[in-house]
A protein has these predicted regions:
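Feature responds to low-complexity, polar/acidic, surface-exposed segments characteristic
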Residues: 2-31, 36-92, 100-121, 127-166, ...
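Surface-exposed binding/hinge segments that line
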Residues: 170, 175
Length: 189
């Protein structure tokens, strides 16, 4: 009888502890777990979610959450992509795909700057292009047009960043997770 009571008490404690989890934490956790499952984050990277999101990491996130996620492993090491990204870089296949698909681009000086921190508007612009939106045809100027469109289709749900603020790894996972259920430019999900 005592064992049954303890088992019941234990199951009630576990059940109650699950109810205390805030909704935002659950959503964030789901986004991060999805990023890990898709290969966008290693388990070590998932442990450092508050670290700034870089352009190289954003390229990896974009590819992982796209139909091209299997192509990254077949890219191989093909020469120098940019002056600061050689073909053997861990981010090289992801950067190559992200640039080829038009989701991201390099700079006029021939660099990509894979270690540069990404701002909210840069990440939203990349996510919108991933979804097929032509960001040059949005109403308004950069970055307001991109941020407004991202907000309208739900990309910014559960993100507290504002214009000009740096994104974290967790923010990047949430943004791309939101892209999974956002309408594409053609109107489909």
């Amino acid at each position: 009888m005592k064992k049954r009571f303890l088992a019941l008490l234990l199951s009630v404690c576990i059940g109650v502890s699950m109810l205390v989890l805030p909704a935002s934490a659950a959503g964030s956790n789901t986004a991060v777990q999805t990023a890990v499952t898709l290969g966008a984050f290693s388990t070590e990277e998932a442990a450092g979610l508050s670290t700034p999101l870089t352009r190289g990491q954003l390229a990896k996130l974009l590819v992982a959450f796209s139909a091209y996620h299997d192509n990254a492993n077949t890219q191989g090491s093909i020469g120098t992509l940019y002056t600061d990204v050689n073909g053997s870089s861990a981010y090289a296949p992801y950067i190559r795909i992200a640039v080829q698909q038009g989701w991201m681009s390099g700079y006029t000086d021939g660099s990509f700057r894979p270690d540069q921190t990404v701002t909210l508007e840069e990440a939203c612009t990349a996510a919108l292009t991933l979804l097929g939106y032509d960001v040059t045809t949005l109403t308004g100027g950069f970055p307001a047009a991109q941020l407004n469109k991202a907000n309208a289709i739900g990309l910014r749900a559960n993100l507290s960043r504002t214009q000009g603020q740096a994104m974290t790894m967790e923010d990047g996972a949430i943004l791309l997770y939101n892209a999974l259920t956002a309408n594409t430019a053609s109107g489909s999900v």
